[in-house]
């Protein structure tokens, strides 16, 4: 028995050796790889790759299970093999021993064969590195000498304003000269120059740029941000705010090389920034591509022979030189342009007024009818401060929920007589099934006796109305049905989804951004491309990207259905600026504002109908 | 639709309508949903209701033997009446029927227990 088992093992190993050799021979006919009997940091997976439907994720999971650390997976399109670059020899050994002839990641659960190789084939580097640089991107190698490097480091080491180490900044040290770059708003305050301007040690740099500078907006910068990156630190992909800075933006790399990623939509280009080189981002590269650095200890870069190799990062200091714009941006790259994305043309107000009813019909009522059930599933937990308001009424008060949706607030306080109304039949039916009192109407024409109601709530409703007049009319209608002394609570979505630098739940649910896997800008650009394919282009309004900050007040917010079609519906919203709700309430007759507050990305107001006696 | 809800509904928003209340109720199908009787609840809700519409509802629901045409004064002590009001206002559920504007005759259908009070733009 024991002998048999041993024999089987030997047979299996022999079979694996044979397979390994055969696969290597096939790969060799394809590209130059030389196997190594001794462990190397490079591993080839010989019999499975992209052409077999293998994903990088699957590979990384398998490798992680062995305890070995992978720096990069190299997969080539259309090939049935792929490569690992491992963090160290030990990691490489762990992966080899844990996966070779063991891992069943092949087609139909076939076992994978691995081999150490001396170097990655030249082919592997091509797809990643042989792309042209983004237009307007230049790298000037050896822009400063080693001597100048030390002089510059000394000069910036002495002074400058240090950023508070919060948020994404916790990973690196940041200093500012000229003006402070505010990471919260990604902007500068031109009215607040810093005492310390750019150190004069930097003056040697500008004459060297004469040949370029003829086409630039500026010839010397007035703002410098210094970032110190330890190995493993990075910066999420971003574009420098268009309206904050002129074209171009310069970045001098000191102390260590690094690889920077440039992206535009699905396009991605990796760019090596050697120590003491100057990066120039101008035109398209400055305005239409995001740039970022992945938080890694080791970069994978092209080797001298054309393959790939690894390069450990050292401590790197970058000097980013910019010049303040002090006005709107006039670039021709609207996708990431804050000026062009936030501009509310005068005509928009006129067109909203003209189309209000059609817009609300198509982009509010019809959408809610279509998404009623799915929407209702996502709306089950009452907001605590709304419940609190409902609990503040005497027992047996009559409370009307205008725009009650699925009626989640109608059963919050069973001591009240709660009645709800909404336009969306599908949502009313959900509430009705739960035994609630509901009827169908429009929030502008509420079929309820005047002065008959003790309390009124309107939660996330009037931001669906397309003009100020209509929003005001909805509040006036609430005031009409309230009895004197009766109180109303209104919630509307806030344009600003942060308070005191804290993100609302809406933003916090954007996990990819919060974990710095991507940025809002990246997501906007991606959605922009997706929607262009999916929807007709004659949307009257800009389309908002979910779980990102609002760029403008009147927007269409996508709702993706959960079914297989994944249909995108666009809901119209007017998101409120600070004080806008209070101002609106102040224009309603017969009421006074009791309280207003910000709650989870909403502006909220409580008002009371003035009793006749106090008039 | 419970008859307590009915008590609040009006067609006053229709162009030219002066009062629009009480609406003319027709019940084609109803059911009785039993609920716990709480005399205090009924008693405290009453001042918020319009008695003419309470009585009107009782007429349509054929409960006029229980509900007087004029609101009695000492209703607090009349627990039997409170119980009957509880039944009328909170237990009778209109599933199918209609509400009609007393001035224009505009009909608002009630189906699956939900009155549709939506007006067209040109009606208001
Ligand atoms: Zn711009």
UniProtKB/Swiss-Prot annotation, chain B:
One Pfam family, short name: Trm112p
Domain TRM112: 2-120
SUPFAM superfamilies named among the record's database cross-references: Trm112p-like
Any Gene Ontology biological process: rRNA methylation
GO molecular function terms noted in the UniProt entry: protein heterodimerization activity; tRNA methyltransferase activator activity
UniProt cross-references to Gene3D superfamilies, sorted A to Z: 2.20.25.10
Protein name: Multifunctional methyltransferase subunit TRM112-like protein
Species in which this protein is naturally found: Drosophila melanogaster (Fruit fly)
């Amino acid at each position: 028995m024991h002998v048999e088992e041993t024999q089987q093992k030997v047979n299996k190993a022999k079979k694996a050796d044979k397979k390994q050799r055969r696969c290597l021979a096939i790969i060799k006919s394809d590209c130059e790889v030389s196997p190594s009997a001794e462990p190397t940091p490079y591993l080839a997976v010989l019999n499975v790759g992209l052409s077999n439907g293998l994903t990088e994720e699957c590979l990384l999971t398998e490798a992680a299970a062995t305890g070995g650390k992978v720096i990069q997976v190299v997969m080539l399109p259309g090939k049935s093999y792929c490569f690992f670059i491992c963090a160290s020899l030990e990691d490489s050994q762990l992966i080899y021993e844990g996966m070779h002839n063991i891992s069943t990641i092949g087609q139909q659960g076939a076992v994978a064969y691995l081999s150490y190789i001396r170097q990655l084939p030249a082919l592997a580097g091509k797809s990643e590195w042989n792309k042209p640089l983004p237009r307007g991107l230049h790298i000037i190698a050896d822009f400063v000498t080693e001597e100048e490097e030390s002089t510059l480091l000394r000069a910036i080491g002495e002074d400058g304003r240090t950023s508070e180490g919060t948020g994404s900044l916790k990973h690196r040290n940041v200093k500012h000269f000229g003006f402070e770059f505010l990471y919260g708003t990604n902007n500068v305050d031109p009215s607040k120059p810093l005492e310390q301007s750019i150190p004069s040690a930097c003056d040697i740099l500008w004459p060297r740029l004469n040949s370029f500078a003829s086409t630039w907006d500026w010839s010397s910068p007035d703002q410098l941000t210094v970032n110190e990156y330890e190995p493993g630190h990075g910066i999420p992909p971003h574009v420098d705010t268009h309206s904050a800075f002129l074209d171009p933006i310069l970045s001098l790399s000191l102390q260590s090389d690094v690889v920077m990623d440039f992206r535009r939509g699905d396009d991605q280009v990796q760019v090596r920034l050697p120590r003491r080189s100057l990066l120039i981002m101008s035109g398209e590269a400055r305005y239409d591509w995001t740039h970022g650095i992945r938080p890694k200890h080791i970069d994978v870069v092209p080797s001298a022979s054309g393959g790939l190799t690894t390069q450990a990062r050292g401590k790197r200091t970058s000097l980013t030189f910019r010049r303040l714009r002090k006005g709107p941006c006039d670039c021709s790259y609207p996708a990431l342009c804050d000026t062009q994305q936030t501009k509310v043309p005068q005509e928009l107000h006129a067109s909203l007024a003209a189309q209000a009813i059609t817009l609300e019909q198509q982009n509010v009522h019809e959408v809610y009818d279509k998404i009623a059930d799915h929407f209702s599933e996502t709306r089950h937990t009452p907001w605590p401060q709304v419940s609190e308001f409902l609990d503040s009424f005497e027992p047996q008060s009559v409370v009307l929920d205008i725009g009650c949706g699925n009626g989640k607030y109608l059963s919050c306080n069973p001591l009240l007589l709660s009645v709800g109304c909404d336009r969306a039949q599908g949502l009313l039916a959900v509430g009705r099934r739960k035994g609630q009192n509901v009827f169908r109407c429009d929030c502008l024409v509420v079929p309820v006796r005047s002065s008959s109601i003790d309390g009124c709530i309107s939660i996330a409703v009037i931001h669906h109305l397309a003009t100020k007049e209509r929003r005001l009319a909805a509040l006036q209608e609430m005031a009409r049905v309230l009895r004197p002394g009766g109180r109303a609570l209104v919630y509307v979505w806030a344009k600003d989804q942060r308070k005191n630098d804290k993100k609302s739940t809406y933003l916090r649910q954007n996990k990819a951004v919060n974990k710095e896997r991507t940025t809002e800008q990246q997501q906007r650009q991606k959605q922009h491309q997706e929607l262009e394919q999916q929807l007709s282009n004659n949307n009257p309004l800009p389309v908002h990207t979910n779980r990102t900050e609002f760029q403008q007040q009147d927007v269409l917010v996508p709702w993706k259905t959960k079914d297989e079609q994944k249909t995108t519906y666009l809901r119209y919203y007017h998101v409120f600026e600070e004080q806008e709700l209070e101002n609106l309430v102040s224009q309603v007759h017969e009421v006074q504002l009791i309280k207003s507050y910000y709650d989870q990305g909403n502006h909220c107001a409580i008002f009371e109908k003035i009793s006749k006696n106090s008039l | 639709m419970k008859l307590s809800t009915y008590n609040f509904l009006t067609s006053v928003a229709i162009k030219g309508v002066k009062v629009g209340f009480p609406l003319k109720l027709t019940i084609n199908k109803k059911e009785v949903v039993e609920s716990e009787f709480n005399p205090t609840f009924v008693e405290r809700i009453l001042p918020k209701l319009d008695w003419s519409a309470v009585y009107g509802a009782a007429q349509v629901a054929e409960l006029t033997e229980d509900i007087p045409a004029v609101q009695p004064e000492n209703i607090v002590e009349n627990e039997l009446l409170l119980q009957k009001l509880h039944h009328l206002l909170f237990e009778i559920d209109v599933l199918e029927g209609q509400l009609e504007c007393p001035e224009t005759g505009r009909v608002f259908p009630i189906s699956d227990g939900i009155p549709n009070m939506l007006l067209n733009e040109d009606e208001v």
